[in-house]
Every structure is written in C-alpha cells, then in structure tokens.
Regions:
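Glycine/threonine-rich flexible loop motifs
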Residues: 131-133
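A short, flexible beta-alpha/helix-coil linker loop
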Residues: 127-129
C-alpha cells in the first residue's frame, strides 16, 4: 500500500483535474477525488477526467465519501470521513476488491477503524489547513508520536 495520498482541492488557479494531473505527473500513485460540496454529476464529470489519468500513471483512484458512486464508477476505492458510512457497511456494499479507508483524529478512532476492517487510515490534521471545514484539533508531531506509541502497544 502506498503511503502518500494526494487529496484533490482547488485554488484560484488550479482545479480538481489539473491538480490531480500535476500530482500524477510528479510521481504520485494515489489520488482521492474530494469534492465535498459537489453534486454526484459534478463528481462524475471530474472522475471521467481524473480516473483515466490515474490508470495511465498506474495510480490508485479513490472517491471521498460516496460509496455508491465509487461502485458505479469502478473506482479503486473510497475514503470515509468520521461522519460517513461505517467501514463495515461500505465493505458489504463494495466487497473485498475495493480499498476502503477512513479518517481518524484520535487513537480511539484508529481502534474503531481497525476493528471495522479499514484498509488504511488517514490520521490528522497534522497542522492547520484551510482546505477542510470544521477542522479537528491539530495533532502536530507530539500528537502523532503519542498515537503511534499507542498503536504499537495495541499491535495495530
């Protein structure tokens, strides 16, 4: 499993597709299409451009949150936030061949996701960001160190 995942976002000059293209051209092998406020049709349109780029670059293509749409589009998987569908429920819908990841902000979140069978866990935030609304408390290096120590002791 690859360790670094590019999560799409927009800036004043770069859109979702262009950002994904640049990340892939830079060697990224793992792209999550994250369009929180978009309609399913808007996500479909962006996916229609990004998914072939991922295939061309032999990269994993995930959708954020949208389990049914990930299945419809034959994405490689889905990333689920803390308030989204539970991992085990998504697994029943998608099956074992899909990658299912989840968001964690605490060690307890990591334990829950591990129990539910998440393939990977995105932990954060490491630092402040404006790309995410309702940001959880920043973990920083000390927070990560504490979580990693607890994971090691728990055998996760």
């Amino acid at each position: 499993m690859r360790a670094i995942q590019f999560i799409t976002h927009t800036t004043d000059s770069i859109g979702y597709v262009e950002g994904a293209r640049l990340a892939l051209e830079g060697g990224c092998k793992w792209v999550q299409l994250r369009m929180k406020d978009a309609t399913d049709d808007e996500v479909r349109n962006a996916a229609a451009e990004i998914q072939p780029l991922c295939k061309e670059h032999e990269a994993v293509f995930l959708l954020d949150d949208r389990v049914e749409l990930a299945k419809e589009l034959h994405a490689d998987g889905v990333h689920l936030g803390k308030n989204d569908m539970p991992v085990d429920e998504a697994r029943r819908i998608l099956g074992e061949e899909y990658i299912i990841g989840g968001t964690a902000n605490t060690f307890e979140d990591i334990e829950r996701l591990a129990r539910q069978g998440a393939d990977y866990i995105g932990c954060g935030p490491f630092r402040f960001t404006t790309t995410k609304k309702n940001l959880a408390p920043v973990l920083g290096i000390d927070g990560y160190r504490e979580i990693i120590e607890k994971m090691s002791k728990a055998g996760i």
